Amino acid sequence: NVTELIGNTPLVELI
C-alpha cells in the first residue's frame, strides 16, 4: 500500500 498526499487528502493506492 502506498499512501500519497494529494492536497490535504491522504489517498491509499494499491500497487
Swiss-Prot record:
Keyword Amino-acid biosynthesis appears in the UniProt entry: yes
Q: Mention one GO molecular function.
A: cysteine synthase activity
Q: What is its EC number?
A: 2.5.1.47
Q: In which pathway does it act?
A: Amino-acid biosynthesis; L-cysteine biosynthesis; L-cysteine from L-serine: step 2/2
Protein origin, superkingdom: Bacteria
Reaction(s) catalysed by this chain, per the record, are: O-acetyl-L-serine + hydrogen sulfide = L-cysteine + acetate
* Keywords (A to Z) from UniProt: Amino-acid biosynthesis, Cysteine biosynthesis, Pyridoxal phosphate, Transferase
State the top-level EC class: transferase
Q: Which cofactor does it need?
A: pyridoxal 5'-phosphate
The record's subunit annotation is:
Homodimer.
Q: Which family does it belong to?
A: Belongs to the cysteine synthase/cystathionine beta-synthase family.
Tell me what this protein is called: Cysteine synthase
Species annotation: Clostridium pasteurianum
Q: Which gene encodes it?
A: cysK
